[in-house]
């Protein structure tokens, strides 16, 4: 088994020096050999995939949307029904257009080679305690994944917001049981899909607050939060690998503690054990998050902060051959978020600076976008011409690097 911890990654031998049962990346018989010359079915490592994923964009506020009333507190006992309780009622309930092939084709044409599809799997789910995913909701997610396959882009699906709903209400053992069941269903449904489909375990809530016996949200201790994070990440990997098919070798994205860079690069965060070598990436969000909310974008402090966050990721993961998936990256910077003494005062310029620093390290940046904010789902173009120029520049740069 291959075990990895942030800052403490072991090789393919156990503590006594005996050779462990780790695949060298070749087909070891656990994954099927496809009767096709389709390159999408060629086994690919996480390192190789990180080089090919290019720039990514999220299909945000779409398949992860759910009943908006009280959505921030999630205080309801079960998932409210939206409209006629059909997949597209949820898909559009936060204002998104119905996803089409043209929307995904446009993303590809604008320079994105990866589409992250956040999914709230609780939608249309019966409140019977079984956590059985709706077949119709699975089918709709499949349709969008198929759009990505046809467009020639990587697709990434996860458990989004539903992780928060579950973690807030259950102890660790019950969370593990539920997430194992959810990922087993998802992985079995997509077991025959090529390696261009990637699974991302969770969103941002690993290590998050939980309801106490009085119904009040309470923060976990760091010790318990790291235990939860590490346990649920291992449950995700075990569930997917246990379904066989192409999931035996599929690249998986491991979610960080809150996807926070400081917490995820701590030595207390552990990468899961896996049956195959180099099939795991780690996911964090927003390399300049605290600067954004402190209204310090564009200044010297902002630049130094980005560099320090990148240095943490390099030391903990990249230097240990663990690719980094920046699952959410700021798309636009409002003027109110800039520092008073900002040297860089243009949103597109700041986007370019961030993408430059991330891609120079080989980090996969995924732009967080909602309906027609950054990329228009009606014109199939990036909304701002300056942003469009930045994306094209880095898309071309990454494409050229692959040809070298």
Identify the function of each model-found stretch.
Residues 17, 22-114:
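N-terminal carbohydrate-binding accessory modules
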Residues 55, 301-303, 307-404:
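Substrate-binding cleft of secreted/luminal carbohydrate-active enzymes
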Residues 60-99, 127-133, 171, 291-306, ...:
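Acidic/histidine-rich helix-loop elements
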Residues 121-139, 161-177, 207-221, 296-298, ...:
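Surface-exposed, active-site-proximal loop segments in enzymatic domains
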């Amino acid at each position: 088994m291959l075990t990895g911890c942030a800052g403490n990654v072991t090789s393919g031998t156990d503590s006594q020096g005996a050779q462990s049962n780790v695949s060298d990346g070749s087909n070891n018989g656990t994954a099927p050999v496809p009767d096709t010359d389709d390159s999408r079915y060629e086994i690919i490592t996480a390192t190789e995939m990180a080089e090919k994923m290019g720039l990514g964009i999220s299909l945000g506020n779409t398949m992860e949307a759910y009943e908006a009333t009280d959505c921030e507190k999630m205080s309801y006992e079960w998932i409210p029904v939206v409209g006629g309780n059909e997949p597209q009622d949820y898909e559009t309930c936060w204002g998104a257009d119905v996803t089409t092939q043209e929307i995904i084709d446009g993303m590809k044409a604008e320079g994105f080679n990866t589409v992250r599809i956040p999914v709230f799997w609780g939608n249309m789910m019966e409140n019977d305690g079984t956590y059985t995913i709706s077949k119709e909701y699975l089918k709709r997610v499949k349709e969008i994944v198929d759009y990505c396959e046809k467009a020639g882009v990587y697709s990434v699906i996860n458990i989004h917001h539903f992780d928060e709903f579950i973690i807030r209400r259950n102890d660790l053992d019950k969370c593990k049981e539920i997430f194992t069941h959810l990922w087993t269903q998802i992985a079995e449904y997509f077991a025959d899909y090529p390696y261009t489909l990637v699974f991302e375990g969770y969103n941002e809530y690993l290590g998050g607050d939980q309801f106490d016996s009085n119904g009040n949200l309470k923060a976990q201790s760091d010790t318990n939060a790291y235990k939860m994070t590490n346990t649920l990440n291992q449950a995700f990997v075990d569930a997917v690998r246990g379904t066989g098919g192409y999931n035996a070798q599929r690249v998986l994205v491991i979610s960080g503690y809150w996807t926070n860079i400081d917490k995820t690069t701590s030595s207390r965060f552990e990468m899961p054990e896996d049956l195959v070598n180099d099939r795991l990436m780690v996911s964090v969000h927003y390399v300049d998050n605290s600067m954004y909310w402190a209204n310090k974008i564009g200044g010297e402090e902002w630049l130094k902060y980005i560099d320090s966050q990148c240095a943490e990721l390099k030391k903990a993961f990249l230097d240990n051959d663990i690719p980094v998936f920046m699952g959410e990256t700021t798309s636009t910077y409002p003027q109110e978020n800039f520092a008073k003494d900002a040297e860089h005062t243009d949103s597109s310029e700041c986007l370019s600076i961030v993408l430059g620093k991330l891609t120079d390290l080989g980090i996969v940046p995924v732009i967080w976008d909602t309906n027609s904010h950054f990329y228009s789902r009606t014109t199939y173009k990036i909304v701002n011409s300056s942003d469009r120029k930045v994306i094209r520049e880095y898309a071309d740069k990454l494409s050229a690097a692959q040809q070298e």
